Amino acid sequence: MIKADNALLLEEPLLRVPYEMLRKNLKTVHKHMTQESTMVEQTLSKLQQSTQHVAAEYGEKQQEEARESLDQLISRVRGLKRKIATLKDEQNETLTTTKARVEHLNVIFDNEKETDPEKQKETEKKWLRTRLERLLTDYFLRQGFSETAKSFAQNRGITSLVDVTILDQCISVETSLRQRHSTAECLAWCSENRSFLRKTRSSLEFEVRLQHYVELVKSGRVEDALKYCQRFLSKNADIHLREIQQAAGLLAFPPGTEGSPYKDLYACERWNQLSRKFVQTFADVHGLSDGSSLLYTLSTGLSVLKTHSCRNFGAPAELPITADKDEDMDPSLTSSARPYARRSENLPSVFGSGFSIRMYGSDEIRGLDTLPVIPPRALANLSSMRRDIAMQNNLDLEESIEDDNEESEERTSGDGERDSDGAVPVEELEELPDAPPELLSAEYLARRIEEATKENTDIIPKTTLDMFNHFYPGCCTSHQLSRADACPVCSVELNSLAENLPYAHHIRSHLDADPVVLPNSRIFGRAKLMEYSHKMMKAAPNTVVDPTSFECFKIDELITAYPS
């Protein structure tokens, strides 16, 4: 069961944002009331002094001035009333949002007091589902999918639990800076929040005005640039003197000057820097988290799963050799294995989770550069039994081999160089009789996919593992066993997110109760590995087969793994 106190650790922005809005609203009301009340008191004081004169001395001119002053006073008071009414509506809306969020968080506290286990479990499941929907909406907004986020929030009924309006405003200003290269919206926002920027000594407004000055110089409007500098930049000389001096140097080095020391000021990258600085400042003003709450929540879970056995995806476990010269390689490698060793650091895992080929229709296949090339050492362990299974599924391997041989002869030059796609000629694999050479060709696999999708558009494999399961039945892992290698920390999507997280310290595995390490550093559950090796691969009694690389190992070589 989820602990309420632990859940609140990640929910600070949920209440922080409406709190900051209420605080800002209160300060705005106080500011307007102070300004207008001072003006009203001064006007009434002047009128009172003027009416103390004798009626005879109080002529028509003085009476007209008094009436005008009263009209202006009434107009200002009415304007103040409209402002206060608008701010009151915003306050009521924020209070409603705050109430809904407090009730949402209070559900898990009330659930701890529930005595019925089934009802308690159902309530917790519903709350977690709502939290996931909140996190997804927040992620959509931060990625710029505003319409998707709004539709999703309305459909799920969680509009009051997400900051759609605030983040939409942030995205609007950020887009104007990064894409349209316009400073108008950002300067307007800086004007509204000038007190906060002054209090935190933020340089955002100066940086935006400096960029506007740079754009004036780039467009050749030198006189306008000088006037703009004197009006807006020079008053910050006590803090940003060095930046102002550099800006003045732009007048002597127009854009396009070769070897200009001011090329960084002219660079378009400054717009991206400004947009990032604005987003950071906007988050500080409204109490938003720096990044997506979804990523923070994922990081919390990944830190629990991350162990020292998790690998960096940039260095595939099955292709550890990255030597550049033949003499630096393992002498046991065959000549056909050496090209793979040199290319290993650029290749994905053979069945690496996360690598996918996106299908854009049955006649066009893109993304084939992500196809893995299976190393010959792994192919050498493919038994003839798997070839028989493939042939029973109407895969004419011999004809395919002949086609690949002809294509290799046409593409390969007389000196034996490899063709442009990096495929090794089939002639180099004569020493591997059990290795189906067509598996080495990305073109062959692409051709088989295209033929299959033309016949049946429902056959659209999404991953490399799906392709091999479809075209080479029996050659891949079972669904149950493949889950053991689908570590979230090692996946392509989450590997970079987990890179800087600390390692967890566990004494037992929650994925497999009996994890073992193979000599190639892969980890599987012993029972699943034994069942797969003997039932699927027909391995010898004292032998196991790696389901990802098809390498064979003796049972004595297995080492019991401990997660931490």
From Swiss-Prot:
Pfam hit, one: CTLH
Where in this chain does the record put each LisH domain? 128-160
- Please list where the region (Disordered) is annotated: 322-341, 396-422
Stretches with biased composition (Basic and acidic residues): 410-421
- State the source organism's domain of life: Eukaryota
Question: Where are zinc fingers of the kind RING-Gid-type found along the chain?
Answer: 487-549
Q: Which UniProt keywords apply?
A: Cytoplasm, Metal-binding, Nucleus, Zinc, Zinc-finger
MF annotations from Gene Ontology? ubiquitin protein ligase activity; zinc ion binding
Q: Which residues form the CTLH domain?
A: 166-224
What Gene Ontology terms for biological process does this UniProt record contain? Answer: negative regulation of gluconeogenesis; proteasome-mediated ubiquitin-dependent protein catabolic process
The terms describing its cellular component in GO are: cytoplasm; GID complex; nucleus
Against InterPro entries, the record matches this protein to:
CRA_dom, CTLH/CRA, CTLH_C, Fyv10_fam, LisH, ZF_RING_GID
Q: Which cellular compartments is it found in?
A: Cytoplasm; Nucleus
> Which spans does this entry mark as compositional bias, Acidic residues?
396-409
State if Nuclease is listed as a keyword.
Answer: no
Q: Which family is this sequence assigned to?
A: Belongs to the FYV10 family.
Q: What does this protein do?
A: Involved in the proteasome-dependent degradation of fructose-1,6-bisphosphatase.
Name the chain's protein: Protein FYV10
Q: To which species is this protein native?
A: Yarrowia lipolytica (strain CLIB 122 / E 150)
- Gene name on record? FYV10
